[in-house]
Amino acid sequence: MKKVLEVKNLEISFDTFAGKVQAIRDVSFDLYKGETLAIVGESGSGKSVTTRSIMGLLASNANVDNGQILFNGTDILKKSEKELQKIRGKEIAMIFQDPMTSLDPTMPIGKQVAESLMKHNKISKKEGLRQALELLNLVGIP
């Protein structure tokens, strides 16, 4: 299987008024195509910091003190915000733990998926809706 994500020795800290706070220490894991990965742990254990670092969504007071995040062989940590925007939602995505911030409950899920597809693939609304339906069927959502 092809390795799509490799997190190596990741260490992240935050600058605070009280000084530097270490959020995660020496986090490493691999994710292969077709696998599903769940990151679990106690509140405050660094799950969100780890996943936000993969998406390039760390707060401005965050410091990556060590490590690499390789997505398809390219280090995410070395990409500019503009480069990250091109891959977020198209090549890599994150489901946030608070579902109310992930999907709009007043809008059909197919339409929300279609909007993302249209934005990243520059396709028509009709094609976006068709592809969204296909993707939802693949994951068992009728």
Question: What are these model-predicted stretches?
Answer:
Residues 1-142:
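ABC transporter nucleotide-binding domains
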